Swiss-Prot record:
Belongs to the RuvA family. It comes from Finegoldia magna (strain ATCC 29328 / DSM 20472 / WAL 2508). Signal peptide: none annotated. The lineage of its organism: Bacteria, Bacillati, Bacillota, Tissierellia, Tissierellales. Residues 1-63 are annotated as: Domain I. It is found in: Cytoplasm. Residues 64-142 are annotated as: Domain II. One of its GO terms (molecular function) is ATP binding. GO terms for biological process: DNA recombination; DNA repair. Residues 143-153 are annotated as: Flexible linker. This is Holliday junction branch migration complex subunit RuvA. SUPFAM superfamilies: DNA helicase RuvA subunit, C-terminal domain (SSF46929), Nucleic acid-binding proteins (SSF50249), RuvA domain 2-like (SSF47781).
């Protein structure tokens, strides 16, 4: 129905946000990770998935296409509905979840509320082969201090001034190794990555 919605977050609640676009407020259910990284009255690009049930029509929101794709994979698993999929994505990152599935890490998967050993085993059984085929872990910063450095913060602010969305910029800095790069190089790398995902 909607691939994504660009708008201003007017409300942030425990498990959903209200995103205003063209004077319409969309109630969008989100993961804990997403909630903890957004601020009211900022503009965001929210990737969405519309789920229609007998008793309700619900819009789920994600910070990236990768997160939405994993949500859809999880909801395809027998007995895993949107609620449990969101619980999993609120407990671990996309890469952590995929790695847990590939390495048969039942212990990690069962950390998600409502996911027992039987359910975790079913997730691994049904998704392992699908995920193994094309899973490439995101680059991680070798030094967590790097992304908090003056250079990365300056580049972040500059990218926001250029009109890139906060969640996209933050995701780039979080998931990309920018150690040793100059501000100019960070900007070039970020713009190339962000432009290709638009």
């Amino acid at each position: 129905m909607y691939s994504y919605i660009i708008g201003v977050i007017t409300e942030v609640h425990e498990n959903y946000i209200v995103l205003e676009n063209n004077n319409i407020g969309y109630k969008i259910f989100i993961t804990d990770f997403f909630r903890d990284n957004v601020s009211a009255f900022d503009e965001y690009k929210v990737y969405t998935e519309f789920v229609e049930r007998e008793d309700a029509s619900i819009l789920y929101g994600f910070s990236s296409q990768k997160e939405r794709e994993l949500f859809n994979l999880l909801t395809d698993v027998t007995s895993i509905g949107p609620k449990y999929a969101m619980n999993i994505l609120s407990t671990m990152t996309v890469d952590e979840c995929k790695t847990a599935i590939i390495t048969d890490d039942i212990k990690l998967l069962t950390q998600a509320p409502g996911v027992g050993k039987k359910t975790a085993s079913r997730i691994i059984l049904e998704l392992k082969e699908k995920i193994e085929k094309d899973f490439v872990p995101s680059e991680k910063p070798v030094n967590k201090e790097v992304k908090r450095s003056n250079d990365s913060e300056f580049a972040r602010e500059a990218l926001l001034q250029l009109g890139y969305f906060k969640n996209d910029v933050d995701a780039f800095i979080e998931n990309t190794d920018i150690s040793g790069l100059s501000i100019e190089d960070i900007m070039k790398k970020a713009m190339k990555s962000l432009d290709s995902s638009r």
